[in-house]
């Protein structure tokens, strides 16, 4: 008998990101909502609904967030059972210079030491997510949205990227890369770019919905300007018929996105409970 041997090529990104807990985001599939699942108004600086996703708002409008249960068609497209839904219940058609509306996830610093920020070996990160939106006052492609990575330790640095949709109310997958030298800068690879090894916040990931001129700036370059959105940021609060959905959020090392990491529910819940645990009086 003869035995034939075959050789299979395994792509480098698969090998590099095949470890457990590759996703730096906790509850990126929005399965855990210890505080509330029903529509709840944004409260500045607070967690109101989905675990690990904090609200930041200072506008004349009102945003609400809630858990959205995906249809079978949604699941077939995104591979996810839930999404984070934002609706506008009070409009603000003119965002003031010092006003803002965002959600963000703070990522614990001691879990980020492998990024090697503050050195010439700093790692590239890739963000992937599914999202959809409706913007009544604009075509889908003209409505630019912003997502920002912020390193707060020592000197705070910000890197904003833009994204837009092809059609209203249609799921689209986004893959966005954050290079440590984006914009030909050395802010992250110098010592001031380091992330302190402690239990504080090492990185923030922000999604913007309406920011005034004091909090907007150039995209695609690291800055220290304190900008949470680009100057092209669309104002989601302009119309009470507007909405925005997101699910499958993953931030990982490397310059390519890999498949979303589905963790067991009990594991993901325990990760959320490190920061907040709701106890029931019933036994």
Please provide the spans of the model-predicted regions.
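Extracellular and organelle-lumenal recognition/adhesion modules and their flexible linkers in secreted
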Residues: 6-283
């Amino acid at each position: 008998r003869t035995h034939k041997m075959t050789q299979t090529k395994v792509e480098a990104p698969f090998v590099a990101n095949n470890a457990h807990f590759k996703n730096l985001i906790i509850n990126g599939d929005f399965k855990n909502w210890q505080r509330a699942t029903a529509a709840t108004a944004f409260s500045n600086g607070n967690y109101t609904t989905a675990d690990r996703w904090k609200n930041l708002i200072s506008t004349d409008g009102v945003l609400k967030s809630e858990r959205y249960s995906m249809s079978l068609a949604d699941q077939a497209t995104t591979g996810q059972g839930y999404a984070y839904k934002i609706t506008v219940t009070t409009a603000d058609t003119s965002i003031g210079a010092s006003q803002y509306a965002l959600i963000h996830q703070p990522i614990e610093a001691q879990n980020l030491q492998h990024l090697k920020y503050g050195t010439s070996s700093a790692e590239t990160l890739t963000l992937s997510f599914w999202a959809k939106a409706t913007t009544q006052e604009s075509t889908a492609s003209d409505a630019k949205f912003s997502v920002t990575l912020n390193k707060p330790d020592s000197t705070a640095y910000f890197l904003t990227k833009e994204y837009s949709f092809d059609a209203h109310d249609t799921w689209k997958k986004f893959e966005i890369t954050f290079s440590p030298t984006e914009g030909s800068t050395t802010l992250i690879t110098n010592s001031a770019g380091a992330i302190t090894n402690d239990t504080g916040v090492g990185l923030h990931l922000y999604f913007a919905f309406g920011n005034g001129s004091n909090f907007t700036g150039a995209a695609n370059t690291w800055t220290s300007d304190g900008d949470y959105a680009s100057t092209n940021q669309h104002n989601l609060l302009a119309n009470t018929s507007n909405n925005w959905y997101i699910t499958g959020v993953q931030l990982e090392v490397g310059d390519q996105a890999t498949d979303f990491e589905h963790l067991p529910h009990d594991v993901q819940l325990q990760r959320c409970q490190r920061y907040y645990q709701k106890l029931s009086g019933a036994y």
